């Protein structure tokens, strides 16, 4: 259900601000978004999986907090990130 390590490394490489960057806000949000999308697919098939639903809500809340932090600190990076991830339609 969680994303594979190879996919995670690909996402990290795409959104990293410098080589070896795994903890920047952009990378964290991108990895969380991929996780959320995977869990969403699982939840459509398994509607009564309440443990996964709780995990999904926790990940969404964490992503929301990270996006709020990024918006507060650097609006330009925030706008670029939500545009590239397809959030906030």
Swiss-Prot record:
Record-level GO BP terms: translation
InterPro entries hit by this protein: Ribosomal_uS15, Ribosomal_uS15_bac-type, uS15_NS1_RNA-bd_sf
Gene Ontology molecular function terms on file: rRNA binding; structural constituent of ribosome
Disulfide bond entries: none
Signal peptide: none
Keywords linked to the UniProt accession: Ribonucleoprotein, Ribosomal protein, RNA-binding, rRNA-binding
UniProt superkingdom: Bacteria
Membrane spanning stretches: none
GO CC annotation terms, alphabetical: cytosolic small ribosomal subunit
Family: Belongs to the universal ribosomal protein uS15 family.
Subunit structure: Part of the 30S ribosomal subunit. Forms a bridge to the 50S subunit in the 70S ribosome, contacting the 23S rRNA.
Role played: One of the primary rRNA binding proteins, it binds directly to 16S rRNA where it helps nucleate assembly of the platform of the 30S subunit by binding and bridging several RNA helices of the 16S rRNA.
Protein name according to UniProt: Small ribosomal subunit protein uS15
Lineage: Bacteria, Bacillati, Bacillota, Bacilli, Lactobacillales
Encoding gene, per UniProt annotation: rpsO
């Amino acid at each position: 259900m969680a994303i594979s390590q190879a996919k995670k490394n690909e996402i990290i490489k795409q959104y990293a601000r410098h080589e070896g960057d795994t903890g920047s806000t952009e990378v964290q949000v991108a990895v969380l978004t991929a996780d959320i999308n995977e869990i969403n697919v699982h939840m459509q098939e398994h509607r009564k999986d309440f443990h996964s639903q709780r995990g999904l809500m926790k990940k969404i809340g964490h992503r929301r907090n990270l996006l709020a932090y990024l918006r507060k600190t650097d609006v330009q990076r925030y706008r670029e990130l939500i545009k590239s991830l397809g959030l906030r339609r």
